[in-house]
Amino acid sequence: MTDFEVVVVGAGPAGAELARCLAQAGVSVCLIDRLPHMAKAAFSSAALPLASIDRFGLPAELLAARWCGWQLLSPNGEWHHWQQSQALGAVLDFAALRQWLTAQVQILGGELMLGCTVTACELERSGMKLITHMRNHKAESSSIRSDWVVDASGQSRCLIAEAGTNARDPLLLGVGLEWLLEVDQNSWQRWSQRLSFLIGSNWVPNGYGWVFPMQPGCLKVGVCRLLNPNKQAGPSLGVLQKKVLGLLDLDGARVLDRHGGLIRSRVGRSDCHGRGRLLAIGDAVSTANLLGGEGIRHAMESARVLAPLLLANLAKPNNLIKSYKNKLKCQLGARWNLSGRLAQRTWQKLHTNQADQRMEKLLQGLKHCSAADLSELLFNYRFERYGLRALPYLFGMGGRSKSS
């Protein structure tokens, strides 16, 4: 049986970034993923601010297009625009990102096992090692041994499951689909250099639609919604997607790829971060930003938080799980927790005229902000720039908010 210091299950941004950091530090690490290659199931809108691209050292070849502005279609059909001359961020080629991260793991000496599904993880009799069992695409079984196992399997939480989670912490579930379209130059120009969103119950009840530029001649168009347990499901995502394409005069574009996915997150982020020698990162511990609908940054950030703690523990055992949970919460900040509550209030309630009117008020209030200010709001949760007392009311939280 092969031995490693750390086994990481899931080669998405969180798992691959953790494996990359550990391999770079000389740790014997094995990265496992059920996909046969990283170009498959590349579901992510993958818009990142420039600061995150620099922080994670992502090379230029991963950037499909840069953006320097925003445009939002409001519930009443009015487009709102925010633009500046300097780039604010980039849309990544998500498949290329995953391929690059996993290639880096191998270059740095880590082991990569693709096309393998982890079936179980158990403690060895000695109590000092974990045995990870898996099955490859030929249904052949094998096992490996390690000091630590990290569940980076995303919303499926295939190993950590729901043990230790606060049952009173609301679980938010979202579904989305995205199509990669081939368009003519004029159509591409119309949507280039900005991130575009459609917000309102007329377009996508309980969610929103989007158009992101990719390489010249390509656009990513998608819809997503937060599931509302108290409301009967509305039109399917496929129906909503076709409606959005027709509204934007993109229904005649050639579809190059279709993909979709599920996102789960707990409002209070009470997920179990680890037990024994099993840890969890990324979407498995609700790192996603559900208000802005993006998860790559925080997933990779969770890897950056855990990596040095694992290195220290391998050298000298300590109370890793408690330190990890506290440091991650500190790194992502209090505003990150507030964003989860705002996401729940915003998207789950966005299916009535009253909710549309609140959204109209919010967009009117943002009219005089700069493009950079809007980025600070959606990516860094700088709510106070727009009046912390007013925002909860506009999002439908009701009553007075206490100042922080």
Task: List where the protein language model places each region.
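FAD/FMN-dependent oxidoreductases across multiple families
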Residues: 227-310, 314-321
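C-terminal helical "tail/cap" subdomain of flavin- and related membrane-associated enzymes
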Residues: 308-404
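Predominantly flavin-linked oxidoreductase catalytic cores and closely associated redox partners
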Residues: 21, 104-250
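N-terminal FAD cofactor-binding segment of flavoenzymes
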Residues: 35-72
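Short beta-strand to alpha-helix junction loop
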Residues: 84-103, 227-235
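Glycine-rich FAD pyrophosphate-binding loop
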Residues: 21-42
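Beta1/beta-strand and adjacent pyrophosphate-binding region of the FAD-binding site
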Residues: 1-12
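N-terminal Rossmann-fold NAD(P) dinucleotide-binding loop
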Residues: 15-16
